[in-house]
Amino acid sequence: MFNGKKKALTFSYDDGVTQDIRLVEILNKYGLKSTFNLNSELLGKDGSLDIKEKKISHTKINPSEISKIYKGHEIAVHTLTHPNLTKLGDKEIIRQIEQDRLNLSNLLGYEIVGMAYPGSQPNYNSQISQIIEDHTGVKYARTTICNKDFSLQRDLFEFHPSAYHLDWEILYKLADQFISLEPTTDKIFYIWGHSYEFDINNEWDKFEEFCKFISNKDDIFYGTNKQILLN
C-alpha cells in the first residue's frame, strides 16, 4: 500500500507558528514528512502563550512564506480562527472549515483536503464529523485523542493519532514496537503536536534524537497525512 511497504510514519503539527521553520529543518534532515494544519485568517499575526511561567512565542508564519517554508510537506485545514467547533452552529462550522480550505488552496495552488480539529478536548463530536464529511471538501480530519495503536481506521473524519510528540516514554515504546513489526497488514504510526511546545522545556534536541532513531528504515514509508491516509 505504501510504495510496496506495510508500515508508514507520519507527523501532524498545528497552528502554523514560526517554530515550524526549525521543525521542518529537522524533519528534512532525516527524510521525514509532516502535515501542517493552518488557520488562514490568523497567518502573520504576532502572539505569545504563558506556559509554566514562561512566555512562549505563538507568532504565525506570514502567508507569503508558506509555500517556501513547507515545501515538500502537506498543508491542511485548522479552521479560519481556531474556535471550539462544539460551540458553533452548523453553518458556522461549515464556514470555518470550508473557507479555510479554500483560502489555503488558493494560497498554495493545489487543493487542500486534510484537517485537524482545533482546540483542546472536547473539540469535536460525531455530528461535527458528519457535517464535515457531507458539506466540505475535506477528506480526513484528525482528533487529539491518542490511541497508542497502528491499526488502519475506518472513520477518516475522526482519525485518532498514535501518540503525542512530547510523551517521550510512550513515543519510544511505540517506536520500538513499530520498528520491530513485521506486519501482514498495513500499519500507521501517527504523531501529532505543536512545534512551539518544544520551547517550553527546550526539547528540540530530544525531538531530533527521536527523528534520528525512527528514520532511515528500509521497511517504513515516510509520508504526509494525505499520502498515507488517502493512498
Model-derived features: where do they sit?
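Histidine-centered catalytic micro-motifs
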Residues: 75-82
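Catalytic domains of cell-wall/extracellular-matrix polysaccharide-remodeling enzymes
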Residues: 22, 82-178, 202-206
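Structural recognition of alpha->loop->beta junctions
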Residues: 66-73, 134-142, 214-217
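Short glycine/proline-enriched loop/turn "hinge" motifs that connect secondary-structure elements
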Residues: 68-69, 180-185
